[in-house]
């Protein structure tokens, strides 16, 4: 059984810990989060330091894997790419809740997270560090690029392309054969009927671009 360190101890981190425990393929040995003090406890597991302490914490606990359980796509991707390969004995763990469904011919990238009820259809490709929230779904032949996310109850039709670092918000829907660019945010409840470019924010039914955005800009802020 792999021994895993969870980076991120807030709400998303606790959900990921529950998924790991429920699946039983990894043993959680500790949490890294700069919002806590070393020795604090998150979801029953000790805080070992901050995300800067991964290699030291891995040596301390004999961990051989890690998962970045942070909701913000840009931050999650930055940490995952920084730490991948930094130590030969550490690799990014892929976490799939036992209540998630993955088609036999779908592929999952290293470090991705599928929470309870997430569905990945036939022929889908899910990139590195992707986060699929509770009850989200990617229909057949979809492609979700590295570090993108679908929030709870977000859904895509078949053959949809979601760009790197892009966030599809709570309950949003994307119809079939649509392409959404990189670093874009689709607001909660939006219905995307056509392609969206890189680095924009889109809201509404149907979804319309309301402004440009910068890569790394916090996407949970208001318009």
Where would I find each of the regions flagged by the language model?
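Phosphate-bearing ligand-interacting subdomains
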Residues: 38-101
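Generic structural signal for conserved hydrophobic packing positions in ordered secondary structure
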Residues: 8, 66, 92, 139-140
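Short glycine-rich anion-binding loops that position phosphate/pyrophosphate groups of nucleotides
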Residues: 12, 71-74, 208
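Glycine-rich, phosphate-binding/catalytic loops in enzymes
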Residues: 22-23, 83-86, 148, 218-220
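Short amphipathic alpha-helical segments
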Residues: 17-19, 78-82, 126-127, 197-198, ...
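Structural signal for interior beta-strand "rungs" in well-ordered beta-sheet cores
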Residues: 94-203, 207-210
């Amino acid at each position: 059984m792999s021994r895993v360190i969870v980076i991120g101890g807030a709400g998303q981190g606790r959900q990921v810990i529950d998924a790991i425990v429920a699946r039983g393929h990894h043993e959680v040995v500790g949490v890294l989060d700069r919002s806590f003090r070393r020795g604090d406890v998150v979801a029953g597991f000790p805080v070992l330091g901050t995300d800067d302490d991964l290699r030291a914490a891995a040596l301390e606990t004999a961990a051989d894997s890690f998962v970045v359980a942070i909701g913000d796509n840009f931050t999650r991707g930055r940490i995952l790419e920084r730490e991948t390969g930094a130590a030969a004995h550490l690799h990014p763990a892929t976490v799939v809740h036992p209540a998630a469904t993955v088609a036999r011919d779908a592929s999952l990238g290293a470090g991705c997270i599928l929470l309870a009820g997430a569905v990945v259809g036939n022929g889908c490709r899910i990139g590195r560090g992707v986060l699929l929230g509770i009850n989200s779904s990617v229909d057949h032949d979809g492609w979700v690029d590295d570090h993108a996310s679908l929030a709870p109850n977000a859904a895509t039709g078949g053959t949809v392309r979601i760009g790197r670092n892009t966030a599809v918000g709570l309950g949003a829907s994307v119809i079939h054969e649509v392409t959404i660019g990189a670093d874009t945010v689709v607001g909660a409840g939006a219905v995307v009927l056509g392609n969206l470019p890189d680095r924009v924010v889109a809201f509404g039914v149907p979804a319309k671009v309301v402004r440009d955005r910068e890569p790394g800009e916090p996407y949970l802020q208001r318009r």
